[in-house]
Amino acid sequence: KKLGIDLIWICPFYDSPMDDNGYDVRNFFEVSKDFGTLEDFKMILKRAQELNIKIILDFVLNHTSDEHPWFIESRSSIDNNKRDYYIWEQGKIKDGKEVPPTNWGSFFGGSAWEKDEITNMYYMKIFSNKMPDLNWSNAEVRNEMIKVGKWWLDLGVDGFRIDAVSHLDRAPFEDSKNGEGIVLDWHKFSNLPRVHEYLKEMNKELFSKYDVLAIEEV
């Protein structure tokens, strides 16, 4: 307070295997044991409110950890009711060999697809293999993430820094022509039209109901 601080942004502290500094969330409603407990956070939040200091949290919308219960269910079978929570596609045959559904590259290197041996299909992951991308075209996924946001806002946080928000939409699954082999063509999954649609929905169903701050990282 003496430093003139009036807002604190807390990076991901959710339960996580820590493959990517906590951005691989295993449970959105729990605090990682590396950082303490939910009760510890409530104490920090209470003290911050007493000092009139706002607290915002990182909110990861694009993906979860591959250890999240949704993904464990999703990968278990093609008929699971959470299958469409993530982006699954069949591989294709090229020169007599199976290859990923497209030649798109990941921000972290290699393909943007990872084959899962349980159902022999590929899930999309534009970051780490351990961070499967959520399927934002699925209304159930959007509703689930709105519930997550509501839970934290009801707890008393003052808003969110929304991580990697420009990547929530996907182009049709066709090979990039911007190079040979695996191609990091971010136009295939960044700044696409439905991102704005999803954010308008989130504003209507979540943010507009609270006096909070939402900062989108693009």
Regions found by a protein language model. Name each.
Residues 157:
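Conserved protein kinase catalytic-loop anchor
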Residues 1-150, 154, 167-218:
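Acidic/aromatic-lined carbohydrate-recognition and catalytic surfaces
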